[in-house]
Amino acid sequence: MSLLTEVETPIRNEWGCRCNDSSDPLVVAASIIGILHLILWILDRLFFKCIYRFFKHGLKRGPSTEGVPESMREEYRKEQQNAVDADDSHFVSIEL
């Protein structure tokens, strides 16, 4: 005899999900957490550059430039722009 004949198969009315219309608080909490997780994941994938740049730099635009010569300010701006440009290069385009 093969193993397939030994396995119990569920009857037709047991194929459905048993947690439908459940008032169990654990099921409700798990559903809410799952939905929130999915929403946050989608937002993260859509806006990850903005989000991580915000957490990295905060609301400030950068360090204060009081008392710093203009040449050093320009050098700092170029470094920041190069860092942003380099950040864009981590995407890989694969053409088949």
Curated annotation (Swiss-Prot):
InterPro entries noted in UniProt: Flu_M2 (IPR002089)
Keywords: Disulfide bond, Glycoprotein, Host cell membrane, Host membrane, Host-virus interaction, Hydrogen ion transport, Inhibition of host autophagy by virus, Ion channel, Ion transport, Lipoprotein, Membrane, Palmitate, Phosphoprotein, Signal-anchor, Transmembrane, Transmembrane helix, Transport, Viral ion channel, Virion
Membrane topology: Single-pass type III membrane protein
Coiled coil keyword on record: no
Record Gene3D superfamilies: 6.10.250.1640
Transmembrane segments: 23-43
Glycosylated residues (UniProt): N20
Family the entry assigns: Belongs to the influenza viruses matrix protein M2 family.
Official protein name in the record: Matrix protein 2
Species annotation: Influenza A virus (strain A/Memphis/4/1980 H3N2)
